């Protein structure tokens, strides 16, 4: 089961705050304070924090990371929690970076960053 499917199944069946709590709205489940899971369409799933899709998985195996202009410790923690294994957001000298440790370790400045074809990771 890939990460996207795992998120969907976990949040559909969750019944307590630590595992997720259904909101009663179709396609939306509260994961923890102000963090929601949302089915964008039949192929796309997003983790939404304070109204911003911070991690978005599409049906092609691509992942989009987005801080929405809110560079807080909690936003960074939520992105790291739901990003694919091997992709990490960190801060150095007040700037955000993304570290990709999957194949050849590399570090790049954080923007609204899209990872192509990470299907085998998610």
What residue ranges belong to the model's regions?
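Terminal leader/tail segments of proteins
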Residues: 1-122
